[in-house]
Each structure stands twice: as structure tokens, then as C-alpha cells.
Amino acid sequence: MDSQDHKAPGFVDIVKSWIPRKSESSNMSRDFWMPDQSCPVCYECDAQFTVFNRRHHCRLCGRVFCAKCAANSIPSPSDETKDSHEEPERIRVCNYCYKQWEQGIVPPDNGASIISLHFSSSPSARSVASTTSNSSNCTIDSTAGPSPRPKMNPRASRRVSSNMDSEKSEQQNAKSRRSSDHYGHVLDSSDNQVEFFVNSSGRSDGEADDDDDYQSDFAQSYAQGNDYYGAINLDEVDHIYGSHEAHDVGVKIEPNISGFPPDQDLDSLNTETIDKTRQQENGWNDVKEGSPPCEESFEPEVVDFESDGLLWLPPEPENEEDEREAVLSDDDGDEGDRGDWGYLRPSNSFNEKDFHSKDKSSGAMKNVVEGHFRALVAQLLEVDNLPMVNEGDEEGWLDIITSLSWEAATLLKPDTSKSGGMDPGGYVKVKCIPCGRRSESMVVKGVVCKKNVAHRRMTSKIEKPRLLILGGALEYQRISNQLSSFDTLLQQEMDHLKMAVAKIDSHNPDILLVEKSVSRFAQEYLLAKDISLVLNIKRSLLERISRCTGAQIVPSIDQLTSPKLGYCDLFHVEKFVETHVSPCQVAKKMAKTLMFFDGCPKPLGCTILLKGAHEDELKKVKHVIQYGVFAAYHLALETSFLADEGASIHELPLQTPITVALPDKPSMVNRSISTIPGFTVSSAEKSPTTELRGEPHKANGDLTGNFTSSKTHFQGKLDGNDRIDPSERLLHNLDTVYCKPPETITSKDDGLVPTLESRQLSFHVEEPSVQKDQWSVLSGATEQVTDGGYTNDSAVIGNQNFNRQEQMESSKGDFHPSASDHQSILVSLSTRCVWKGSVCERAHLLRIKYYGSFDKPLGRFLRDNLFDQDQCCPSCTMPAEAHIHCYTHRQGSLTISVKKLPELLPGQREGKIWMWHRCLKCPRINGFPPATRRIVMSDAAWGLSFGKFLELSFSNHAAASRVANCGHSLHRDCLRFYGFGRMVACFRYASINIYAVTLPPAKLYFNYENQEWLQKESKEVIKKAEVLFNEVQEALSQISAKTMGAGSKGSTPNKIKLSLEELAGLLEQRKKEYKDSLQQMLNVVKDGQPTIDILLINKLRRLIIFDSYAWDECLAGAANMVRNNYLEAPKNSAPKVMGRNVSLEKLSDEKVKSIPTHVAICNDSLLQDADYETCLNQGKSFADTSGKFAIPEDVGSDRPPDCRMEFDPSEGGKDNFVESSQVVKPAHTESQFQATDLSDTLDAAWIGEQTTSENGIFRPPSRAASTNGTQIPDLRLLGSESELNFKGGPTNDEHTTQVQLPSPSFYYSLNKNYSLNSRKHIMAEDRPVYVSSYRELEWRSGARLLLPLGCNDLVLPVYDDEPTSIIAYALTSSEYKAQMSGSDKSRDRLDSGGSFSLFDSVNLLSLNSLSDLSVDMSRSLSSADEQVSQLLHSSLYLKDLHARISFTDEGPPGKVKYSVTCYYAKEFEALRMICCPSETDFIRSLGRCRKWGAQGGKSNVFFAKSLDDRFIIKQVTKTELESFIKFGPAYFKYLTESISTKSPTSLAKILGIYQVSSKHLKGGKEFKMDVLVMENLLFKRNFTRLYDLKGSTRARYNPDTSGSNTVLLDQNLVEAMPTSPIFVGSKAKRLLERAVWNDTSFLASIHVMDYSLLVGVDEERNELVLGIIDFMRQYTWDKHLETWVKTSGLLGGPKNSTPTVISPQQYKKRFRKAMTAYFLMVPDQWSPAAVVPSNSSSAEVKEEEEKDNPQAVGNKS
């Protein structure tokens, strides 16, 4: 092989010399090629090299390949500048390197940027223009490619500390102008100069930038030294913006240290290079981090003046120096003043002229931050039982942790590039070293890890080392498990490793860090080169070192062309031996070896070393200090942002320590959470606020009110809490301080906020529950602030308590806040284009984790999203100024609009962002809100989390409700402006209405307040009574006039006159008592009862009719007596007492032989029966066992005097009391009554028995007299029967006439005997003589009052034009009761086992309504399951499904035959037992109705409403009725189970379907209709908008939107969404979706479609009242045809759009999707952690998973 290889070497060399070759660039040196002699075969394919198969070296890795394996070429990464027209040089590479180049690992430049990482630093650079520098003589060198080997070994010089004396002296000079103060809340304008480096490792656009990156940072590492580790001082806390004085850096940096060319300084760099660098440094546009999708936005209406461009013009600057342009040659001098280590700088280095509002807020800020942070750390230590104060010689942990936390936070400036996170927790590591003292704990400005050098002879301590980081392994084989021939392997490996080490050594590194293993040969070669090796380093640790030192990670040795080295001040390895051993540990002492990279130039990481305790205690301290660092960092940023905004906070007392319960300490359940009294910091909901421990506020001039937050602590089980990173735990624990619901202020008159000791934080509760004190937060769903009388959105709370609490209870197990919920904010984001009037991105939910991967710095958000003029909207292609962005959260919306200015704002090249605001509440200046002076945003404010910025904007607690200089709320009352270049963004907060969702209630609510129609009815009754009494009065006057004007021919004229006077007195008394009693009844109101009961009014009307008949008969009798006494008459004929023979004849026909003349009654009305409705509902018998009326003892004294009129010549004026056995003797005329044969009948009747006369006519129940005298009932109440008894007293020879009102039994007989089956009824054809006007008025009303009494004597008049009155009467009829009872006696709620007496013993004044007697009918059943089983069982027989009731009325309006068919009678009755308080309420409501012109429908069917608005009556078509007959059993089952299991449902309950028919026998008029009775979803509501939604916009638009009761459709809602959106809370949205999901699944299962969601917007209560209606239609063949016609477009309309009528499954999907999109969810504390955007297809996915299982969805938590 060798002979072939060297066959003709001379000839080959000669031929090669003839071929012209281009000169190799320095980085293509053949020194790093594999020797030809050691490579006889191809590295890749093992092909033997011959004269014809020549060797080819890869120009990148140096290995030898054949022509086939090295046939690729790439552009040469040469440093030489090429002309634009000249093609770039190409070099040969192997297949492996070519693939690496294609994948982007090897960039097409000089290889310096091995991994291209986009990043940027904080761009504010506000001090560029205002800073001068004297350090322009600083020389900056740069070298391209590998550094030439210096004369003196650089590694040797860095190992001798004495060689650095000159640098140290320069360090002291720089140090004298810097402070050692590290107070953490002071924030630095970190980029106050033009920097020639980037803020993160791994990015370079050129070699000069690579080395410049090191130079700037490295040069300042001298000046900074250890001056970051001084004591924390609060004296200069107010100096936020820092000094911009010149800082001389007079260090002449040696070329062998800096690596810069000696002939290039800062002045030689042109402006273009600086601009390019600034754009690279500040231009976040390089990072195309995709923001989450947006949804359509709803911006509140802006005021008119906002459209005026003058409003957007920036005001004058506060500091004129900020407007000066930068002097580019001086930029390098700012490096030391800037402090490249983090935002926070020593406070005494600030220039007072740059501090804004320092006089007002400095003291408050200092006290707030210092006191709050120390209190937080103290309580964290207290929770872990760690010593806080000094113990002997040992210093307490409180001061140590406070100092270390602030120091670590000071050193941080997180890389906010795409590759770096914002979370400071990822940049701080804590190491526990159980030795030394506590005071020896320190912060290392760099990386500390458990590693050691690979060889003991390698140097372990190097000052100013150069670090080279190599990824992968340093081995020969670059591909795992590759096979080679053994004979060449060893030689090739040694040659390759020599080449690799030589390549490494060419860059002069002091330390080589390798990710994986290193060959033993390579280790020996590195030792010989005096390069310290550290191998097997984890990738994460390698990246940390790279980030802090600035070194780039070279992927492999093949790409090691021009790497970027890292630097630090000191590299050393130390070994620590444990001196503190915990009691549980073995006595053996352990050793720990740590490697230090101290003094790193990048502010991207530090390490805290904890000493002075055993391992267990240090772990606890580690836990606390991780919290402390994050809190300090976060407080610092927010404090700086607060200062930039010019806000002020109150200086509040710091007396009570706070308590924080740690999530990983579940055993300590007694850890309460309280706060510092009267104090809140600006960290919004993530910082502790204040609370009083039940003691009054101490006098404080700055304390104007109590602060409270909306954040509610929670109970719930957290899994894996120990895995939560420290920043998450800290944010959560800071959140737990904000756990007072609004009721803590509103419920206390003395203004004290109770402690939260009773609201303990528990993370391990087996069954998550909501504590009682949290309900106010849920029901209010708002946050309150009481600060000097300033309250936000407090009016919303009271109107939402009931419904929101109901929603909370209905879904207690849904979503409870977890630890992750408190470290992020969930907002709804939307974007719309104003220029085009289109929605670019629909509203969607976006969760931003604070300082997380999806978060952005505030400044970067402004630059990328709002100020980038090159970025256009992908939806509408319009620029940023054409759009409005809207973020909504809780009770507010933040609207962001952008405009372009006519002139540039200063400082665009330096990245200056200007801030100012205009107060909307201050007096206008020239018609515009006054503006503050504009200032430049500080770097710390620039780096504030945008998520936290949003939280501050939305929060209502005191930390966010900061006060501007004018005294108004900064976020609520001011327009906030941010400007950059020509662009200005305006942020405006506006309160929004968040609606609660109200589903149809399971138990219907009946409003018992006075209703207008009831008032009208009661007035009509009074009017009719007055007409009656006036007529009686007139008749009495006429009769009396006859007695006065005619001569007496009788023997007792005086007695007759006296009797008439007594009758007149009785009339006046009755009139007065009637009015007084009725008025008293109307004025006495009881809860849950009708103030005016229509059933009482009906009974009164019926009784007045009987009263009119009695008075008419009485007056006729009186007139006959006058005629008999004063006129000539036969002596042997007795007077006709009853006056008219017609009535007596009809009574005789009814087999009423006599009327008892002396019936003892109580002074109570029939309306007073205490158990009236109870009888109706439970079937009680109210006849006592003796069959007698019981007389209450307490009313005996109120019994009125006897009201009879009698005149007896023998007895004079003495009352004649007759025993009950006495009867009126016949006076030889047929007009006298015989009563002897009625005694037994009446007794039986009163007890409740029924008798039938000989001719089959129903005999009424009656009652025998029980006392020895005639008692007229108490007439003080109109409700009493007007008992006008005519009584004929016994006489011997001379006849005696006694005139009395008829006894109660007379009217009772009339009530029971009044049967329209008899054409000879007394009153049906009666023509009144004396009360004709009243009778005419009554008949004219159309009420048929003389129908037989219903069950339990209910009086329900029938109106021919009101079908519900026919239904109501049918439901109370005995025929209906008999059909309903059947064989199932237990379900009989209208039992008639006992007769209901008209005159019971309970005083009417004790009752105001029949509702006192109502009993929930569901009590008669054992359980809901029994109801369902019985209900289904009864449906097995068709004859049991429907009940048919017929009756006839022969009243004065005419004879009519009525018929009512009750479909599914028993099932509906069982449903009403569950849904209605009682059957009586249902019947009472149906008693009256009115025709109603319902809008929105197209069916043109009959609609009616019950007069109390409780029910809707809708005509049902034949098809709908047939459909319901089919799916009726499924409907009853679904609705009953939903109610019993409390599963959400939005179905509007149908409580009955009836067929009503009537036929007038005269004229033949007929009426027949099928109707359903449905609950009125809009009962007792005032709606501003009403929608009927089907989920389709096709033909769903109502152009008439002006009417008050106009029903709007889908397209109307879609059009209104941009301007008047409907916002709902997260729980309300989930409740709505669950209900709709359940109902649509059920409706689809029974093949129902074309239903609608009726939505009423109640702005008074902030509620959405909704329910699904019109679900009676199944998808039958006609609907199939309609779908086809509408789809084809034969009858008009778009052909491609989906019709409104589609299959049930398609309808369900479309309906769900639309209802989800129509109602926008505003995130709140109940929002789930994982959010699915509203416009996603998740509904369809869930549908397949839970198909046809709506109950599972409803019950799932």
C-alpha cells in the first residue's frame, strides 16, 4: 500500500505546482489537517487511496476522504471582503460537515458564531445623550481568527498575581467612583451607552463584534471588582435613574489579555457600525417569538377628544438632557457607570436630577420596600423555625438572607432573548456548605459547581482565565459505534487528537470545558500544553457557564475555527470539609469539592454560598433565600416602574409581621396569613398587602383608607408541590396574603379589616371546598378599594350576590386555584382594525406566566408589538397604528391604540421610550386633559414583566390603584402614553360589565308583590260592592218613603218602621265593616304570600253575587210587609216573606223544604279558613268530629249584636230566641217553609256527607244549628256571607213577622246546589228587582262565577276568551281529581274526603292569602326516584296518559259546553310537584291570562301570558304535539333527573300541554286549541336587550332595533359584539356551556332541532337570563325537505351557506360552537389553568369522548 502511495511523489508534486491555487485563509491552515501518511483509507467509506482514488481533506474537520465522500462544497467563511459582483469562494467539505452546514449548525461566516442565538439587551440607553466621558483614550483591540501566540505565555502571566498589579491599581481608581451599596430595589438604566456587545452568549454577526463583546464586559470587570458586595443601604432608595457622570476607565488593556487588534480604537468605528450594533443590541425584532393568537376585541367607547391628533402630541420633557443626542465617541465611558451587572446599582451613584417625584415618594418607597421585604423574610424564617436574631457569636439569618437576597437581585440582568428566560430564579443557584460561620455566607458573581480538574497536575487556580467550551466529546470517532480497521485506528486516533489539541491550543485557552468524555491521549496532550481540563459537565451547567462567562459552546472540534472564549476574574477549586453535622447524621465528616468561576463579566447568573449550619438547616435556609431573591428582584422592578410613572404611595406603619404558609409544609395547617397593617406594596397581587388584626388604625396622616385585594386564598389538593420552582412558590405565597374578600371591608362599619387567621391556607384538603368567607368574592366578582373614599366598581357587587353564589354552589368542584394560577395572569386578548372596521383576531384567552417563556419585557412588547413600523397585520396587512388591541381581565378592559406622530421623538437610535400620562378627571386645558412631563423609561421598567404590567393595570387593590400627582387614580383615571420615534401608544382602562348567568330555576319563584292587575281586580270588587250597597240603600229609602207617605192599616206600623230603620243601620254597618276589613286585608303583608290573592277576590265576587240575591229578596220581603201592613190585604193571608214566588218555587224544585231559621255561626268568614289551601293540597277534611262549627274563645267578645228585625205585639221589642228544634209554622200559604224534614240532612251535610234527592239532584252539605239563637256573622269583613235571614216567628192567633237575613246554610246550599244541569236553578234566570245595576255590571265582566265549586271550594271563574281560565277550572274539578286519583291514592293531592266549610273558626285577620295553606306536594312522595318510577310506570297504559274533563255553564252570558284534555296529566302533575311550590300556585297563576304579541317567532300562532307573567301559553301545532307525544317520557325523565342531580340545564320547563275547546249552544260558536304552558324565563325582569339565538346568521337579522321589547337575532348580536360585547365570568361561562352541552345532547338524542336560546340582558342586575325554547320540533320529513330547499337556494338566499334547519347532530354542533363564541369569557380567579381558545374545535373532540352522556358532563367537576 505504501509503495503504491509513493509511486511517483516527485511527479505529483510537479503537477501540483503547475495548477494555480488560491491562497488559503488563515483559518484554513493545513496545520490542522490529518497527515496523509496516517490515512490509507477513506474515513467514511474505507476505500483505499490510490493514484486514481486521491485523498481529499475536508476544509472544516481536516479528515481525509475520497472524492466521492468529499464532493460537497459550501461558501468559504473567509474574512476577506468580497465585492458584491464577485462570487464567494467555495471550499470542499465532507458529507458530515455538509449536513451540519445545511442544518445551520455551521454558519456561513468565519465560524465564530457556532450556535446562532437571537438575543438582545435592555435598550433604554437613556443616559447616552446626557452623559459625557473623559475616557476616549481607551484603546480597544480586536483580532480576527485565532490569536497569534504572544511572546510571553499568557497562561503563565495569568497564573502570577503580581503581574496584575497595574490592573488592580486601575481597578481602585474606578472603584473610587462607584458605591458599594447594593440596595436591591434601585434599578439601573443598564444600557446607558452604545454597547459593542450583546447581552447573551452565542450571537455574533462578525468577528469584531465577537471580541468586542468580551472587551466591553471584560474591561469593566476591573472597574467593578467586588464593589457589588457592600452593605445594603436604603438612604438613596429614591435615586432610581442613576448618575450619568463621566467615569474614567484608564486601563490600558494589554493585547494578550483583550484579544483586540492594537491598531483599532473606538473612534475608528463608523456611525453605520454603531447603528448596526445598536439595532442588534436593542432590536427585539430579531426575535420573532410568535405571540399567541388573539380574538376579537371589544373596546369601550372612547371619548371624542381621543380622535384629535393634538391629544397624542408629547409634552415637554422633564429633563432636557434626555433629549440630547448621544456623542458616539463617549459611549464607552459609560460602561462603568452603567453597571453591566444587572438593573440595580449602588444608590449613591444616582444623579438627583434624574429622579422623578423623589420628594413625594422617596420616603414611602424606602419604608415600603425595606419594611415589607424584611417582614416577608422574617415570616419565612419563622415558618421553618430558623433563628432570625443573633445567637451568641452567630449572626441571625434575617440580616444575612436579606442582604444576600438584595445582593443577588442586584447582580441580575436576565437575558430576555428567545434563548434566555426572564425568570430570575433560573439565574441564581444556592449551594449549601456545612462549615464555617453564617456570616461567611456570600454571593459569588459567577458559577460554583461540584467539579474538579481532570488531572491532579493541572492548574486549579487561575486569575483572569480564558475559557473554551466544547460540546460533545473529544474523541477520534465522531459517530458512535463506527467500525474501522484495527491496524490504522491507533495511529489515526493519535494524529487526530494531536491535531485537535493543536487547534485548541491555537486559541490560547487556559481552561477547556468538555461536555462529555475526553480521550486519554488528548488529556495528556492538554496537560503538556498547560491547559486545565474539566470534563463530563452536564449540558445545563455548561450552558450556565457559557452564559456567565460569555463563551460560546462549540458543538464539536470540527467547528473550532474562531470560537468565542469566555472570561472571569478568578478560576479556582476548593475543598470544604463539613464541620456542622446534624444529629441524625453519622459522625463521619464529608468533604465537598467546589469549582469557582468567580467575577464573570455577564450579569446572567450568580451563586449564593450558605455556611454556618448543618445540611438540614441550610436546606431550609436555601428554600427561604430562593424566595427572597425572587421577591427582591420583583419588588425592585415594580418599584422602578412605579417611580417612572410618577405615582405615589402612602407611607404606612410597619408593625405587624406577615405570615406566609409555604406550600410544601402541609402539616402546619394553623399558619394564618395576615399582613402588615395599612400597608401595600406595588407588586400588585403578588406582593403581600395589609390587614388589621381587629384593632383600629393608628393616626397617620397618609393613611386614608384600608386596602384590600381580590385575590382569594384557596383550599385544594396540590400534587407534586415539592417540584414547584422557588419563584413559583414565592409568587404563590405572596399571593396568599391577598385573600380578603370584599366583604371584609363592606361588612364592617368601623372600617376594620379582620385577620385571616380563620381563613387558613391548606393545600391538602381531600375534598376541595370553598370557604364561607370566599363567597363574597365570588358573588361580587369584583375588587374593591377604599382609599380616601375612592371605590371601584363597587356597585356591581350587590346586584350579583344571589346569582353568583348560586353559580358557585352549582359547580363547587369545577376549578379551584392552584399554585400555578397565582404566578400568571389569564387575559382575553383581541385585535381589530379601525381603518377597515374588521376583526383581525377574535377574542381568545391568553395565559401569561410571569417572567416565563411566553412573557415579554414591557419595553420589548412596546417595541415589537406597537412601535415596529415594518410589521403589518397578517390578517388585514395594515400597520400597527390601524389597530386597537384590547386586553380584558376581571372587571376591566385595557385598550391599546397607536398613532404616528408628525415628528420624531428624541433618542430613537438609542432606544429611548418616553412615558407620560393625561388625567381625565382634572380640569381641561384648551379642551384637553392635562399632561405630565415626559420622561425616559428606565431599564428596570423596560424589563418589567408584561404580564405583571397587565396585572397592575387590572388590579383594584391599593398597590395597583396608585395615585398620580394630581391625586387621581393613575390607572383608572389617566390615559397612559408611551412614545418611541414617531410612534405613540395610548393605554386606557375602562370598567366593563361582567354578567352572571341565570339558568331556569329548578323551583319556580312566584312573585307575591302587588301587581297592577290584582290591584285593578280588587278595585273592581270594591266598586261592585259599592254599587250593590248603593242600590240597597236606594231601595230602603224608597220603601221607607212609602211607609211615611201611606196610611197604616195594620196594627204595628211603628214596629215596621223600626225594623226598616234597623235594616238601614245594618246596611251602613256592613258597608263600613266591609271597607275596613278589605283595607286591612290589603295592608297586612306576610312573606311568601300574595298580598292580594286572586282566589280570595274570586270568592268575594261570588259571595257578593249571593249577597245581592239575598238583599234583593230581603228588600222584596220588606216591601211586601209594608204593603200588607199599610195597604188593604186579606187578614187571613200571611205576608209573602220571600217576596217573589219564582225564587221559592225554584227552591222547592230543589227539594229544599225548609231553611233553618236559627243557625248558630261564628263571627268568622268563610275566607278565613286557616287550612284552606292545605285542604286543597293534602285533601284534609275541615269538618270537626262533632260536625259542629267550633267557636274560638278569643272572638266570643267580638260577636256583634243580633241583626234580625222582629216585631211581636205580645213580646214588644224583645228579641225572640228560638231553639233549634223550633221551625217556622206554615201560615196557610205555600210561601212558608217547612223545615222539619231537613234536620238530619243538614247535619249530615255539615259533616261532609252527601245526599241525593229523589230526582237525582245533588243535595248540598249543610249543618244543623247548634245554638239557641240566630247569630248574624261578623260583618266587619267583606268576605263574610251577607246573611239576610227571613224568619217567620211562631204565633198563636195573631201572626208575627220576623225579618232576618238568610242563614249561612242557605248560601251553602246555593253554592253546592248551583248546578247548571238544572234549567230551573234559582239564580240562573233570576231577574233582580232592586239590585239590577250591580247584576248587570257583574255579568258584563264576562266572568262565569256561578259554576259549581271546585275541589275544596275553590272559586275559579271561566272567561270565554281566556283559555287558561278553562284549564285552571278543569284542574280543580272533582272530575279531574277522580281521574287523577285512579287506584293510586297516595298521589291524590286534591283529596275531597272532607267538606270544606265556608264558615270556619279561624279569624280572617290571621290570614292574608291562601298560600298560608300551601304545602309542597313533593312531600307526599318518598323520593324523586319514586316519582320517576311511578311516572314511567303510569305511562305504560295509554288511558292513563291523558285526562279529559267536560263541564257546562248556564250562566247569564249563555250556555257553553267546555272540554279540556290534559296530555300526560299525571306526569306533568308530578313534574309540577317538583318545580312549583304548590299546585295552588300553578292554578292561581293560570286563572287569568291575556293575549300576548310575542316577537321573534315566525309561526304566527297564538301566544298568551298569565296576568302575573309567570307562564307563557303558546299554541302547539299538530306536528309539534305528535312529536311531544313521542318523546314526552324522555323529556320527563331527563328533566326530573337533572333537577334531582342538580345537573345544569337551560331547558325552559313545560309544565303542561292541554287541548281546550268550547261550544256555545246558542249560535254554534266553537273554539278548539292545543296549548302548552311554559315558564316565563323573563319573569319580573327589565331587559335592555333580548336575543333569540339559533347559532346561524342566515336570515337571522332584525332590522328594527328601536322597540323596547324587540327580539334581536344572531346577526344583530354579531354586529353588536365589537361595541357592546357580552362579557361573562369564567364560572358563568362554564355553567352556560355545561347546561348547553347537556341539553343539546338530550335534544339530539330525541331528534329535536330548530330550538333557540333566549337570552335577556339585565343590566340592572348584571345578569344574563337564558333558556332553550322551542324544542318541540323533531326532524321529520318536512324538515328534511326544508333543509334541501334552503341548501339549494331555490327560494333565495346564498346557496353555499348552511341553512338554519339541519339535522339534529349538525344543529347541536353548530349551536354549541356559536353559544361559546357569542359570550366572551373574562378571566377571573375561577379561570382554569389550562385554557382552550374559544374558537377551537375542542367541543367536537369532547363530544366524541362523551357522546350522548350529558349527565356525565353535568356532574363532572
Swiss-Prot record:
Keywords: ATP-binding, Coiled coil, Endosome, Kinase, Membrane, Metal-binding, Nucleotide-binding, Transferase, Zinc, Zinc-finger. It catalyses: a 1,2-diacyl-sn-glycero-3-phospho-(1D-myo-inositol-3-phosphate) + ATP = a 1,2-diacyl-sn-glycero-3-phospho-(1D-myo-inositol-3,5-bisphosphate) + ADP + H(+). Pfam families: Cpn60_TCP1 (PF00118), FYVE (PF01363), PIP5K (PF01504). GO terms for cellular component: endosome; endosome membrane. Its EC number is 2.7.1.150. InterPro entries: Cpn60/GroEL/TCP-1, GroEL-like_apical_dom_sf, PIKfyve_PIPKc, PInositol-4-P-4/5-kinase_C_sf, PInositol-4-P-4/5-kinase_core, PInositol-4-P-5-kinase_N, Znf_FYVE, Znf_FYVE-rel. Zn(2+) 1 binds at residues 42, 45, 66, 69. A zinc finger (FYVE-type) spans 36-102. It is found in: Endosome membrane. It is a peripheral membrane protein. Residues 125-193, 276-297, 313-346, 684-709, 1729-1757 are annotated as: Disordered. PANTHER family: 1-PHOSPHATIDYLINOSITOL 3-PHOSPHATE 5-KINASE-RELATED, 1-PHOSPHATIDYLINOSITOL-3-PHOSPHATE 5-KINASE FAB1A. The PI(3,5)P2 regulatory complex regulates both the synthesis and turnover of phosphatidylinositol 3,5-bisphosphate (PtdIns(3,5)P2). Catalyzes the phosphorylation of phosphatidylinositol 3-phosphate on the fifth hydroxyl of the myo-inositol ring, to form phosphatidylinositol 3,5-bisphosphate. Plays an important role in maintenance of endomembrane homeostasis including endocytosis, vacuole formation, and vacuolar acidification processes. Required for development of viable pollen. Might mediate recycling of auxin transporters. Component of the PI(3,5)P2 regulatory complex at least composed of ATG18, SAC/FIG4, FAB1 and VAC14. This is 1-phosphatidylinositol-3-phosphate 5-kinase FAB1A. It comes from Arabidopsis thaliana.
